Every structure is written in structure tokens, then in C-alpha cells.
Amino acid sequence: MKKVIAITGPTASGKTSLSIKIAKKFNLEIINCDSLQMYQKYDIGTAKITIEEAQGIKHHLLDFLTPGTNYNIYYFQKDARKKIEEMPLPLFVGGSGLYLKSVLFDYELTPKSLFLPPISLTAIENMVDFIKKKDPQLIANLDLKNPRRILSAYQDLLSGTLRSQKNKKHNPLYSSLIFYLDIDRQILKKRVILRLEQMLKKGFIEEVNQIQTFFPNANFNIIGYREIKVLLEGKITLDQAKTLIIQKTMQYAKRQKTWFKNQIKPMILDALSPDLEKTTIGLINNFLKTD
């Protein structure tokens, strides 16, 4: 099997910094695995890597879609697998777990619901409530930041199918070394708060305003962008928006960790360890020695 490496973890856990160090050490190119960072203009609010931060490391499937473009996990699976075949040793970086799993495992996808019109936030919330009642086990594994995944699960339940009880293929297609950067929840919260303040200083509110102005069909059902949009509509204050963003980010991080541990079973690393880089390099060297 072809070897693949992935670095995952919650927002503000240090994925970007570690990935650049690893890419430079092993002369690798990076495949982005953050579903939001694939879109242009969503820069500040997604903490998208900058040219300076990339330090010359080539990134694929990053910043290549116009806001509002119909692109989802179905297309990503195909594009990412093509990239894997083009690289000696691909390095995936990002926290979109289902996207990563769809690529690395024998995950069957169909292009259904690719060209549906935008879904309102109220409709999404109603669908989530319905899913919780009908199939509670599914919620822990569902990407609640992705309206299309919510709609797909909702449609399955309407047809009488409990998706959590489906027999899916989980056979690996590649020999994968997947790292998950774990971090103490209280420290993570402090980092999230600090990062949000930095985003606001960099112009996060103006970024949302620009996207809304020039791309009215763009997706705003995203943590951070949704709250800033509501702020711009005058429905909440800045302090309320900040509180909501922090709260929802932490809730998502908790679900994210549960999902990765149950679905992918990655190698969990201490994101705050002073030996993180050294440990990661050692594990990769051992991985590359195996057949």
C-alpha cells in the first residue's frame, strides 16, 4: 500500500506550524484537508495559512474555489486521491475528519445533493433536531458545519434508514500514519479566545462583509462567519457574537475529538509537548521503515 501521513486536530492546536516543520524535514508537499480553507476569500476566519507561514511549501486543494461553488466531499475524494498518486509521500493537514476518511478508506460516495440550493439556518437547525431524536448516535459523527452532510443524513432518516446502523466499508486504501494533536481543553479555550481577537484585529468583520457583498450565494453556515453575518445585520452585539463563536468552536472541538478517536483512531500527540517535533519525526521515520 502507498504510504500517507496526516496531521489533524482542533483549531488552534498547532497543526499548521508542525506540518511546515515536517514538510521541510521530509521534503513533502501538503494536501489541505480543511473543507473551508478550500474557498477563496475565507482567509482570516478560517486561519488559512499565509504565504509567509507556508515558507515555500507547496499546498494542494487550498484556496482554489470561488465562494458559493458547489464542491463537497464527493469531489474532494476524487481530487485528493489523484493528488496522492502524484506524490511520493502525501501529507494531509486539516481538521475535516470525514473528508480525510473518505479519501483514505474505501468510502463509497454518490454525487447526490450536489446542486441543491442554499439551505437556510433555520432549516438546518430543524433537521439537526430531527436527527437527534431519530438517530442520536449519528450526531457525534456528523459534521454539523456542513449543511450538505446534515441534509443527506436527514434524507436518509426520512427514508427510514438509521445511518449509524449502516454497514459501511472501512477498509483502508493506503498505509496511513495519522496524528491527532490533543490539547488541554482550558488551554485550547484560551487559544481560541486569543485567536478570535487576532482575527478581529486583522479584519474578520470586513472579510465577512466583503464576501456577503460580492458573493451573496456564498456559504455563511460556518462557525464565526454565521455570527459575524448576524452581527452585521444588527441582530446581536459584538460581545454576543464573540461569546457565540467561542462557545460553538469549543463545542465543535469536543465533537471533533470524539469523532476522530472513534472513526479513525489516530496516534494522539500532546500538542503542548516541547518534544512534539522530535517525537513526530521519530514516528514518521519508523513508519517509513515498515513495509
Swiss-Prot record:
Top EC category: transferase
Keyword Phosphoprotein: no
Keyword terms of this UniProt record: ATP-binding, Magnesium, Nucleotide-binding, Transferase, tRNA processing
Record-listed ATP binding positions: G9, P10, T11, A12, S13, G14, K15, T16
Record site feature (Interaction with substrate tRNA), residues: S96
SUPFAM superfamilies per the UniProt record, alphabetical: P-loop containing nucleoside triphosphate hydrolases
Molecular function terms from GO: ATP binding; tRNA dimethylallyltransferase activity
Gene Ontology BP, a term: tRNA modification
EC number: 2.5.1.75
Renumbered residue ranges of the record's region Interaction with substrate tRNA: 34-37
UniProt similarity note: Belongs to the IPP transferase family.
Reaction(s) catalysed by this chain's protein: adenosine(37) in tRNA + dimethylallyl diphosphate = N(6)-dimethylallyladenosine(37) in tRNA + diphosphate
Its biological purpose: Catalyzes the transfer of a dimethylallyl group onto the adenine at position 37 in tRNAs that read codons beginning with uridine, leading to the formation of N6-(dimethylallyl)adenosine (i(6)A).
Protein name, as recorded: tRNA dimethylallyltransferase
Chain positions recorded as substrate binding sites: T11, A12, S13, G14, K15, T16
Needed co-factor(s): Mg(2+)
Pfam (any one): IPPT
